[in-house]
From Swiss-Prot:
Name recorded for this polypeptide: Small ribosomal subunit protein bS16
InterPro entries hit by this protein: Ribosomal_bS16, Ribosomal_bS16_CS, Ribosomal_bS16_dom_sf
GO molecular function, one term: structural constituent of ribosome
GO cellular component, one term: small ribosomal subunit
Organism from which the protein derives: Synechocystis sp. (strain ATCC 27184 / PCC 6803 / Kazusa)
Alphabetized UniProt keyword annotations: Ribonucleoprotein, Ribosomal protein
GO biological process, one term: translation
Organism superkingdom: Bacteria
Family membership: Belongs to the bacterial ribosomal protein bS16 family.
Pfam family membership, one: Ribosomal_S16
């Protein structure tokens, strides 16, 4: 199963995340199938590749809880329904 989840990167205590599509059995920092965006919890900055995310969701990818809340804030699910 393909999941949309966060991949950690950055220095200690200055962490940020990439939003990626990867198989559910792949380790957290393993090689992703596709990078779909960026999230920095310190500054609350988010950059998303919305068309690619919508494509992955239509193909059946399941977002994790944290990614789901980020996508809800960015109103990606409204574009999925349209």
């Amino acid at each position: 199963m393909i999941k949309l989840r966060l991949k950690r990167f950055g220095k200690k205590r200055e962490v940020s995340y990439r939003i990626v599509a990867m198989h559910s059995t792949t380790r957290r920092d393993g090689r992703p199938l596709e990078e779909l965006g960026f999230y920095n919890p310190r500054t609350d900055e988010t950059r998303l590749d919305v068309p690619a995310i919508v494509k992955r969701l239509k193909e059946g990818a399941q977002p994790t809880d944290t990614v789901r809340s980020i996508l809800t804030k960015a109103q990606v699910f409204e574009q999925l329904k349209a």
